């Protein structure tokens, strides 16, 4: 059988990669070679489409920034030696900063002892992390299922809700327009972006979407489901929509949804994959509203920016449906020792360093500054909004938002648009960001807006920044 990749030697590939992995420093020649190799690998073996969305990739495709190492809790360096202030935070994974030394130390200690679990013996850190989350999460959430990502934590939540509600004849889920819950089949059924959904239709049946923040629309949908016998098993929401554009709901919305769930016997699933672990100024965003879910989804920052881990935390009443057969829903690597070590150290960092409080303090300063800029440039900006250090600037056109992000990149500040709302540029730095760094962001943002204000009225100039 002929192989189209017969010219490739896998041993040479691994040896070349290991050379770079084990290199503390790179010579200029090594940097240039690595940069070109990575661009080639993405183009030929990963997905060339990704290069179209990188702010660092030039029109000719001859340059793309390749990250090399973290240079501090809030900064990273590329292979060319450029240092960037990270205001994207890996979409919210670096809450305790890049390469947090205490998280790394915990993982290294576990790595030296036993990297992965045997599956048959009881792994201690999984138990200790579950106990920690029971103590950390609001209300009477108690039992935890561990996975490897946010979409997996949502899948587990949906399956858990189905297992609990199916004997009660309830199979329907209600989510929100603008929602993002992941891209695996079940999570995608709750996600609302048409571009992500259409190629995989039909998705799972029994999902409805209503306007986020509109309790009247939610109640009408529940009532309509009841009229047709499609009783609601669960309502799944993000307390604040992240990929929808950092949409903060009315203050009474989540309490009203909680009351509606109690009224009709539906479960409330809150997806705090992005809003959890101190991001919004409290450990969990639902705490701003005094609301406790029946099932809570966590991931992203739970691993401290060192290990991937997801968690689905539920009340005993709900989780007990898995007691009889704990193998109904499992995953090989979920709750592995390295991930649990990272998560335990992350929680410790958040608590001992008061990082949720820091997010509230620095977030208030940053948001006030962004809102002042929005008032100065209403022709460009609709509004700046957010909570804690989950913030967004919504521009009047997609092209303006992309141009803003690209100009900030040229000034060595990383930001990005949100997946479901291209006009909204998110600002989501590590919770360790300093006041001085926040001030730098505001200064550079003001300079960029001043520049764009002079160029954006010319539609021909805007084509340079357009994203098809």
UniProtKB/Swiss-Prot annotation:
PANTHER family: AMINOTRANSFERASE CLASS III (PTHR11986), PUTRESCINE AMINOTRANSFERASE (PTHR11986:SF112). It is an enzyme of class 2 (transferase). NCBIfam families: PRK11522.1, putres_am_tran. Its cofactor is pyridoxal 5'-phosphate. Coiled coil: none annotated. This is Putrescine aminotransferase. InterPro entries: Aminotrans_3, Aminotrans_3_PPA_site, Class-III_PLP-dep_AT, Putrescine_aminotransferase, PyrdxlP-dep_Trfase, PyrdxlP-dep_Trfase_major, PyrdxlP-dep_Trfase_small. Pyridoxal 5'-phosphate binds at residues 150-151, 274, 332. It catalyses: an alkane-alpha,omega-diamine + 2-oxoglutarate = an omega-aminoaldehyde + L-glutamate; putrescine + 2-oxoglutarate = 1-pyrroline + L-glutamate + H2O; cadaverine + 2-oxoglutarate = 5-aminopentanal + L-glutamate. Belongs to the class-III pyridoxal-phosphate-dependent aminotransferase family. Putrescine aminotransferase subfamily. One of its GO terms (molecular function) is diamine transaminase activity. Its EC number is 2.6.1.82, 2.6.1.29. GO terms for biological process: L-lysine catabolic process; putrescine catabolic process. SUPFAM superfamilies: PLP-dependent transferases (SSF53383). Pathway: Amine and polyamine degradation; putrescine degradation; 4-aminobutanal from putrescine (transaminase route): step 1/1. Catalyzes the aminotransferase reaction from putrescine to 2-oxoglutarate, leading to glutamate and 4-aminobutanal, which spontaneously cyclizes to form 1-pyrroline. This is the first step in one of two pathways for putrescine degradation, where putrescine is converted into 4-aminobutanoate (gamma-aminobutyrate or GABA) via 4-aminobutanal. Also functions as a cadaverine transaminase in a a L-lysine degradation pathway to succinate that proceeds via cadaverine, glutarate and L-2-hydroxyglutarate. The modification N6-(pyridoxal phosphate)lysine is found at residue 300. Keywords: Aminotransferase, Pyridoxal phosphate, Transferase.
